[in-house]
Amino acid sequence: MDDLSEFFVIEEMFISEPSVAGMKPSTSKTTHSPPPEEPTAPFVNDNLPNPEDEPTIGDLNAFHSGEELHRQRSELARANYEKARPEMIANQRAVTAHLFNRYTEDEERKRVEQQKNKEAMNASTSAPTSSRNGGQSVENRKRRNDVVVAPPTSEEEWKRAQQQHWMGQQQPQMQFQMQQQYHSQQQQYIMMQQQHHHMTGMQQIHHQMPSTSSADSIRSVPTPASSMHQPSPAEMRNGCGMSRNATMDMTCSPMSGGQPIVDENNLAVPEGEWFDKLALAVAEQYNVDTILGPDTYDTFLAELDFSSSESPTKQSPMEMNGDRMPSTAPPPAQNPQHIAQLQQQQNKMRLMQQQQQEMQRIEQQRRQQIMQQQQQQQQQEHQRQQMLLQQQQQQQQMQQHHQMNGGGQFATQAHQQAAYMQQMQRMEQIRHQQQQAQQHQQAQQQHQQQAQHHQMGYGIPNGYPQQMHMHPPAYGAHHMPQPTAFANIN
């Protein structure tokens, strides 16, 4: 029985032995996997991807769904484009036809004017030639060459004014020359007209263009403002120059094909009613969720609410007075003065709000700055106290050391040690500076030498690594044979 118990005890000891602290099985990874070695040859590719990191087929589903969505969207866009395209083409065709018609009209008008000029010239020359004067015929010939330069038509004057305005906008330095040129041309025309009248014996010819009188030439250079909305004479003739603002959508040009053609001539500044309609349209389409949000549009919304709540209050006292106002009658239109006053009030309110916000912002900034300054002062104070504490502790330690080492000589020894350390630091700094200067000089020398080598052709790369040629060779001043690219001739 004792033997058995002894056997069990021994067994127990053997079993529990590995759980002793020294024999615990190691969990560290380094004992199992040795550190990865550097590859011996440079062309061994160690960076192969881990096949377990590859994406699975299921990961592609999201990608494919995205592609499909994109394809559907592009198909939709294509269909929309196909729908809209014929209309776009038709619009372009209308514009092109309009331009072409204008061009042909211009050509026709030019031709007619040339014809008129010829007729006028013939009429003016036919009268005096009956008196067969030699000198007069010379005069006639001279003047005939002059009159070919026709006086400017109203159309040309309008075009010149517009062109002058545009040129002045583009290059300001050109404007003065243009004006000078225009003045001189006007003077020429006046001279020609006077000469013409004189020659024809003051008889007025029916065909000739309206003369440029001195009264006209006073306002010869139109200002940009006047020429901006000035309708062209062609449109004045067609009778659409004046009635612009009433019928914006009905334009007079016959080639517009029922489509409104708006250019710089029939473009009118919109009146107040137009603005009201626009405000209504904006308010109808306004949606809090989609557009910027309530905070930006708060003022506009408040104004809208204010104006809408005001109209019933205006109506109510009239209704309470008596039944003479039927309930179905439209609310009375506010007079423009009242509207202007309202707008002024709103503008004042808005300005005051902005000023208040600005004041609050400045106040906040000032508070923040004061807080920051206080924090900085506290931090500095804290640092100062800590420094004082450290100094006190060091002094205490010194005193303790002094007491332990038994007085006398330690104070002088500490002083000596400090002086020695300072001296060492100074020496180190000087050595460092010298070293830097030397390195700089060497680098400069090396640079010059490299440039020389390149000139002489030594700098051409051969397969060998670059040598540092300029370092002073080792072992005293003896020239040790260095391995060079060429045969060593020393």
UniProtKB/Swiss-Prot annotation:
Q: Where are stretches of biased composition, namely Low complexity?
A: 341-359, 391-404, 413-456
Ranges of Basic and acidic residues composition bias in the record: 105-119
Which InterPro entries is this protein grouped with?
Transcription_activator_LAG-3
Cross-referenced Gene3D superfamilies: 6.10.250.990
- Its predominant location is nucleus
Instruction: Report if keyword Transcription is assigned.
Output: yes
Compartments reported by the entry: Nucleus
Q: Which Pfam families match?
A: Activator_LAG-3
The record's SUPFAM superfamilies line, in alphabetical order, gives: Lag-3 N-terminal region
Biased composition, class Polar residues, residue ranges: 122-138, 307-318
- Which terms are listed as keywords in the entry? Activator, Notch signaling pathway, Nucleus, Transcription, Transcription regulation
Q: Which cysteines are joined by disulfide bonds?
A: none
Q: What molecular function terms (GO) are annotated for this protein?
A: DNA-binding transcription factor binding; Notch binding; transcription coactivator activity
Full protein name: Protein lag-3
Q: Which gene encodes it?
A: sel-8
